[in-house]
Amino acid sequence: MKKIFDEVRSLDKRAIEEFHLTEDILMENASLGLKNYITKKFKKNSSILIVCGSGNNGADGISLARLLQNKFKVSLYILNEPKTEIGKLQLKRAKSINVNFVNQIFQADVVVDCLFGTGLNKELDQDSVSLINSLNNLNSFKIACDIPSGLNSLGQITQTAFKADITITMGALKTTLLTDIAKDFVGKIKVANLGLPEDIFQIETNKYLLQKSDLKLPLRDIQNSHKGTFGHVNIVSGEKIGASIIASQASFAFGAGLVTIVSQNEKNIPCHIMQSKSVSENCTAIALGMGLGEIESLKLEEILQLNIPKVLDADIFYNPLIVKYLDENVVLTPHPKEFISLLKLTNIANISIEELQENRFLYVEKFCKIYPKVTLLLKGANVIISKNDKIYVNIFGSSKLSKGGSGDVLSGLIVSLLAQGYTSLEAAINASLAHTIAAKKYKNNNYSMSPQDIIQGIKIL
């Protein structure tokens, strides 16, 4: 896991005050981070266009031009003259070694965006909007310095934003880069070292970025076992049996020893999945909500009252009964529209999808502060998983998963791990990672993946 911070100004300040680095040293290391990436990735004498604003982000770019001089064909475009003293000093240094300044942008091999940093707190003027749009239209490899210009400190876009192939962010990961809105603009994310070891520069935080290496598969280490050793999943089916079948197959593929669909009507289901009209006596985890539709309230409450680990999904988030059971150790897996309903039922907020998507971290934190026992998994382009005051972000999701049934696979994976003894937080994190990594490895085109393809991918992780 990697630490994530809402802001890093305090980290920069601490580096200066406690570890005696200077603003100049921090900036030199920021520029070195950019320079090292460019030097490693691109051939000598490639054309590099560095586009700078008037603040410290622009000063980073001017410093970068100096470091790349004579190794690449460097051109420096300055939208506005530097306002800061360090920016003016960097400009003087660049001029002293005859860095090439240009008055127009052009098609270069590489474009580096150094216009605006994380301090952007106002609407862009028309010149800036036009420039960013023109940069986006260039067929160049695009690098954002620290943050794509146009993203504000909350990861929101008011007019336009630079669309990077990679963002090289300075010192530490920032929440602003990990919003759903930002995902189409940041590209890959790489952290540049600012002159101190990571564990010294960074402090404690409550937010973490999940890595592929964090995935812990339910591998079977014991040989003296039987099917009951690995848990018995019960998936409660409502009107739409398809969702329950998908979830049951995912559970079985992810290690559950037994899987039963609980339904009042006999259904035609896969032969390795069992059926029952009531929850099994030896059930070790329940999934409820997928394809639920209308179900008798007494029957629903009877299931919710069972002291068994649960995954709650889909239709359940529109039922007021759920509020009574949010003090229990359950996993909730809403998509944004369902989470809005849940926020309304709990009197936390009455907001639109747009408001939620612009402030996903905020509303997740609000919800989990009031319901600290719950593990919440908010679906999205970047999945947010939270329990109590801790937040974990999974950025491995892709548009391949934007298909009906993908969420049912996820619920099946989570309940499978719960049945096998994982804690609610462990189950949510590992199932989410498995779900997104399996989808990422899907080799065919990105519009054709089905739930069965995800399940097949799970089997070969």
Name each region found by the language model:
Residues 80, 103-105, 171, 193-195, ...:
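Residues at the C-termini of beta-strands that transition into short coil/loop
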Residues 126-142, 296-314:
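A short, gly/pro- and small-residue-rich
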Residues 1-71, 75, 166, 177-309, ...:
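Small-residue (G/A/S/T)-rich helix-start motifs and N-terminal tracts that mark the onset
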Residues 93-97, 119-124, 289-293, 310-311, ...:
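Short, flexible loop segments at the rims of nucleotide/cofactor-binding pockets, characterized by
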Residues 35-114, 123-145:
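Nucleotide and nucleotide-moiety/phosphate-recognizing core
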Residues 109-110, 115-205:
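Internal gly/pro-rich beta-alpha loop/helix module
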Residues 94-100, 125, 148-153, 214-219, ...:
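Short gly/ser/thr-rich secondary-structure transition/capping motifs
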